[in-house]
């Protein structure tokens, strides 16, 4: 059993851990929302004390200059990519929304901590609206792009969309909507589906996602599909009617979510998520820095479904 210190890394929200070859890589939102930094270690535990290396800083102005959110690091065909959301302003639009779009930077060098990063620009989608929290994965021999975006035609902040990719920064074909906020637990504070993450187990592909406002209402939902089914057919997807990971008042863990998944060297699945240990937030929760990174093993039920359990209490 892995009993990681809790919190695992303080003041890092939207945590993402990549296991690649003999190393683990960690990237997340920083409280200042002004840079992209990577940690690398030979073990999961080693990430806690690994030195963060800043690989990109937001420019003074322009579309990638403000509020750098939820980066993910991916190795694709021998190159490194970071996907992240950014905007040109802190101002909200006419709908009261932040004005983020998704962007990609690329490193063709073997070492993403010392290599040169180039900006590949915005990931264009069919509508030019608030977009964030993209991830990418291989499934059925194709590369996919999975993200959250505001629809001009649907009430709420963001829905989840899936599209095939022509290359790591360009979509191919028409995206499909996989989920929108519909249950009450997805609509507390704001109507939100965001932060999707992919987990494959047995004959199913799972997508976890986060819902509601980023306070104690924040929680995780779950979609799944048979691995052989066509992911571009929305009717092939199933959606859990209840959250699969949520606030534990008993353990003083509030608003767990915006997760990713990694694995131990033994192949155990690990849930990587953030949560706060208090509810008294002054002002916008986004500017409260104490969403801490936490780790928890994923249990698997006999029916092949994941059991995320309850957010464990702080140990530190």
Model-based region annotation:
Residues 1-316:
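Carbohydrate-active catalytic/glycan-binding domains of CAZyme proteins
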């Amino acid at each position: 059993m892995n009993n990681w210190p809790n919190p695992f890394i303080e003041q890092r929200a939207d945590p993402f851990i990549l296991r690649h070859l003999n190393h683990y890589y960690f990237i997340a939102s920083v409280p200042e929302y002004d840079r992209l930094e990577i940690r690398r270690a030979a073990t999961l535990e080693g990430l806690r004390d690994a030195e963060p290396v800043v690989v990109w800083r937001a420019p003074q102005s322009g579309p990638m200059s403000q509020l750098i959110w939820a980066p993910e690091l991916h190795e694709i065909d021998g190159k490194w990519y970071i996907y992240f959301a950014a905007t040109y302003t802190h101002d909200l639009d006419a709908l009261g929304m932040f004005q983020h779009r998704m962007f990609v930077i690329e490193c063709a060098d073997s070492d993403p901590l010392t290599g040169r990063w180039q900006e590949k620009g915005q990931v264009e989608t069919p509508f030019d609206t608030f977009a964030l929290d993209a991830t990418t994965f291989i499934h059925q021999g194709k590369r996919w792009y999975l993200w959250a975006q505001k629809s001009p035609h649907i009430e709420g902040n963001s829905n989840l969309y899936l599209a095939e990719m022509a290359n790591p920064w360009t979509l191919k074909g028409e995206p499909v909507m996989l989920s929108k906020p519909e249950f009450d637990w997805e609509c507390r504070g704001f109507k939100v589906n965001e932060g999707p993450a992919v987990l494959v187990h047995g004959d199913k592909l799972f997508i976890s996602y986060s819902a509601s406002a980023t306070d104690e209402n924040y929680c995780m939902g779950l979609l799944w599909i048979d691995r052989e089914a066509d992911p571009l057919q929305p009717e092939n997807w199933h959606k859990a009617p209840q959250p699969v990971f949520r606030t534990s008042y008993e353990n003083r863990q509030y608003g767990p979510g915006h997760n990713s998944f990694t694995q131990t060297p033994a192949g155990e699945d690990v849930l990587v998520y953030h949560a706060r240990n208090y509810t008294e937030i002054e002002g916008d929760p986004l500017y409260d820095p104490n969403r801490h990174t936490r780790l928890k093993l994923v249990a698997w039920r006999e029916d092949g479904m994941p059991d995320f359990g309850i957010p464990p209490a702080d140990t530190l």
